[in-house]
Amino acid sequence: EITTRLVGSEMCIRDSPKEQYQAFRRTTLKMRGELEQSQLGAELAAQEQVLCIVNRRKTAQELYNNLPKEGSYCLTTLLYPAHRKQLLQKIRERLKDGLPCRVISTSLIEAGVDVDFPAVYREEAGLDSILQAAGRCNREGRRPAEQSLVQIFTLEGQHVPRMLEQNVSATQSVLKKYADLASPEAIETYFLFYRTLKGDKRLDEQQILQGFEQDMEGRIFPFATAAERFRLIETPAVTVYIPQGKGEHLLARLRAGEVSKTLFRQLGQYGVPVYPDHLKTLENAGAVCQISEGIWELTDGSLYDNNTGLAMEAETGAAWFA
């Protein structure tokens, strides 16, 4: 096992980079290697407050389904945004009150979500994602770094999702060169490795490396910005709208022929992104209908669970594993 300290999601580099860097060492990184999903689930269930971030929405649902229901939550984009906001509020309240709070999430919780867990598990991903995950552990610096573990793992029998292969490869290259993954040099090297693997053009379109070139000698280390720009490189998905809460009324207006930016902006709070194979599964099960070109509505309410969101499987027996 390899152990090294991590910093939070943002680093201020001012007159004395080394001193400022030391001030942000709040967690300890532990490389766990391969775990069986049942073993991971048992470890999570044994902890009172813990965050586990995985790469697949289906994995998140499976892990959640094997946890004690009291104080356990599943956060993925299979929950529409308004629903996620409600759950996040409950999560923050339980963390604040010291109540049991076990959260299984995909990477969405790494993007600007202000939560503070005493322990974090992160499935193997790019260094940008690992450091963002670390920013959700001991965020307020109230616990010793040695007691604030960020554990990196792979799951037995699961390969790295294709869209993350180059990120993971770049991280592994950095691990061979640097003991401290959170050092500014390691992070810059990570993005340089990624640029080499991906090709300059794709990264230059998002101006990721330019940000490092401008700010490595400046005041703010642009890590959060770079991570967010990485997320702009997306995979194709369509939106299925869920007729729950205000979403039901908004969809009725859409079906009646109303079309406006305001309506679609409001509807966005009730949309779930699905990939083509997942949409096909829902179509084959007769669970969705197309209101108009590219606009889908869930018609089988039994496929939306109040805890885990839109089902990955329907009565056809097919499934989408992303």
Regions found by a protein language model. Name each.
Residues 2-13:
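Single conserved hydrophobic/aromatic residue that forms the stacking wall/gate
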Residues 16-37:
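Glycine-rich phosphate-binding "P-loop"
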Residues 48-49, 70-71, 98-100:
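Short coil/turn segments at beta-strand junctions that form active-site/ligand-binding loops
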Residues 4, 45, 94-98, 112:
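Conserved catalytic network of the ASCE P-loop NTPase/AAA+ motor domain
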Residues 39-47, 53, 58, 62-68, ...:
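C-terminal helicase lobe and adjacent C-terminal extensions/tails of nucleic-acid helicase motors
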Residues 95-110, 122:
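Conserved two-lobed SF2 helicase motor
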Residues 14, 26-29, 72-74, 120, ...:
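Conserved beta-strand scaffold positions in the cores of enzyme catalytic domains, especially
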Residues 113-117:
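Conserved ATPase-coupling elements of RecA-like P-loop NTPase cores
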